[in-house]
Amino acid sequence: MTSAVELTDDLVKEYLTFRGFTNTLKYFEVDIKADKDKGFRVDRIVEQLLQFVQSYDLNGLVEYWAYLERRLFSRLEDVYRPTIHKLKTSLFRYYLVYTIQSSRTDKAHEFFQKQATELQNQAEWKEWFALPFLPTPDSNRTFSTYFSRQWADTFTVSLHNFLSVLFQCMPVPKILTFQSDYQKIACLQEENEIMRQKLFALQAETYRLRKDGPSEPLVLHKLPHYVSNMDRLGDSELGSNIMSSHSNTNMNTPSQRTSGFLSSLLAQNKKPPPPKSTLPSVSSPTQSGGSVPLKKEVAVSQAQKAKELVGGTKEVRSSPNILGVPGTESSMVQQRHKRQQERKELLSKTASQVSTEKKAENSDADPDLRSDTQNDTVDAVTRGSGASGARKEEKPAQPFIVLSQDEYAEHHSSIMHCRVDCSGRRVASLDVDGVIKIWSLDGIMQTKASAISKSALLSLEWATKRDRLLLLGSEVGTVRLYDTEAKKNLCEIGIVEDMPRILSLACSPSGASFVCSAAAATSPSQTDPTYYSYGESGNNQVPGKLLLWDTKTMKQQLQFSLEPVPIAVNCTAFNHNGNLLVTGAADGFIRLFDMQQHQCALSWKAHMGEVYSVDFSYDENAVYSIGEDGKFIQWDIHKSGQKVSEYSLPSDATGPFMLSGYSGYKQVQFPRGRLFAFDSEGKYMLTCSSTGGVIYKLNSDGSTLENCLSLGGHRAPVVTVDWSTAVECGTCLTASMDGKIKLTTLLAQKS
């Protein structure tokens, strides 16, 4: 703690100098020089006490000990009171012994004159009042122990140890943990780099052995648990006859299943892969530049190999090309053409046909793998015809490794919001029944707090400065401030009587205020997915207000002007310093507000229909939005909302979300929470889908949107997402309509 205090003091000085706060810096340095805590250095505190003793400054000694009692000892439990009293008694006796040893009996008389009122009723001091009058107190049986060098050293060591333990157990502010956190992060980064190098060395060795062509099956090193799990195959796409033929072949080649994962990482080691060893992904015939999760690539690869085995000896004889044995150019062209035809036949199956095969042949297969395989096939079928034929260039390596996927299953109805707090340690989730769950993200997923709202809740937001507080917006026009540690409501305020629905809440990064979006009562378009009521301008006309509230006083500061007419605002987001606020409304407009002037700086028509979700880019030079029209659009805020890029997302990524059941049961949910989230560098985006989250890569030029990874794991449509990053590992949160929340931990691979 001592080093942390000194480092923090230096950082504060550097910051004040950088900002030009010279007066504050002068006062800060003066306070440091007069610091009675001595920077929480135990040796300096003990030295100060001994200095008072050696200078016979009784008043200074008594006052400094009283300060330590108020500042430090008062925080201790009552069980430590006797120890503190013994230390104080020993300190005063040390002072008296020093005065007698230095022949200053006048100072001993002064001590008893000033402290007699306090000490005369204490039994341990009755014999000490005679000390100044004894001719040789060091030979007295009662006082001889205190005149020994051993007792003096024992006392100073005991006082030093007591203060050291006290400082170690004393709670410290977060700023003092900066150095220790930095060291932990550096240690984790070093461990990650070591593990990555081991993994690359393993796959390089495997590549070398396979290139040499051993006559016996390879015996690979045991891979980590998460690596072996990532290489599981989604074999549900294959027929039973192909499955049996493929399993017989696998008995002779036990290393093929593991090598699929290792070969995909060869590009990371900057070594050229053998010809034809990297197979195109499922999405390659219909979309250039896309990529899919690793296990899906292996599934397609195994399907192609199985087809070759069933096809006859000609395909079997050509299989060495798959293992990296070079062939003639003509045979490679013919084989590429055949594989392209086989992939087209495989992808010609519709989603329903795949589902029928899965029910008939793989009823006991893993549900996560089945859903991932189905999602991959549907994506391949429904995706646009952007490219024809297989990709000839090498497929880039996967940007993430899936370390684990856990499930939080405390909710029993559809999730509306799922947000990580500013510290990245806790998650707040809200379902349609008004149940709020606060649970830990690091380590074991343990529920910290739980509450049920009598009135329906529509919005949720973490407070920024005091991250223990949660803002909850209801359907009856109130905003509730909930303390997640005390597990109680601190206050509940009414917003607007005629605008009961609190659609969105956004807390300023400064923590001084929050923005609240209130809207009129539920419109038909929010309950019936087939009903749309548009005004003359072709927009959904739902009246609403956008208000700014003070967080401390919980009073309204102002109401923003929404032009041309007051309209319901569905989503809000601040930039990093709270100077800008972006909103998406029911009329399809995006509005950018200057929070210093409290005025609308920019507004533009963004979507046909409502804007569902909006957020700033990583560099805050652009704004991204998802609307009712199914478009994901990037806007340049420096060019009056000029469109930079536009992409069409699947309907299961934008909503409305639909869940069907038995006897014609159908549940429809309109978007409420975040529909997309970025990683720590803003290069990758997480979106919703019918079977799990999907990660896209955002190219810097805005030309393409690459599908990088499908997380899967859900049986119901995902309705909201969030992405929490810590060091190189990030946690993706995907919440679905069946109340399940999946936490997928990813490890980013360095390019």
Curated annotation (Swiss-Prot):
Residues 238-267 have a biased composition (Polar residues). GO terms for cellular component: cytosol; early endosome membrane; endosome membrane; late endosome membrane. Gene3D superfamilies: YVTN repeat-like/Quinoprotein amine dehydrogenase. Disulfide bonds: none annotated. It holds the Pfam family CTLH_Armc9. InterPro entries: ARMC9_CTLH-like_dom, WD40/YVTN_repeat-like_dom_sf, WD40_repeat_dom_sf, WD40_rpt, WDR91. WD repeats lie at residues 410-449, 452-492, 517-559, 564-603, 606-645, 668-706, 713-751. Residues 183-205 form a coiled coil. Residues 356-373 have a biased composition (Basic and acidic residues). Belongs to the WD repeat WDR91 family. Functions as a negative regulator of the PI3 kinase/PI3K activity associated with endosomal membranes. By modifying the phosphatidylinositol 3-phosphate/PtdInsP3 content of endosomal membranes may regulate endosome fusion, recycling, sorting and early to late endosome transport. This is WD repeat-containing protein 91. It comes from Xenopus tropicalis.
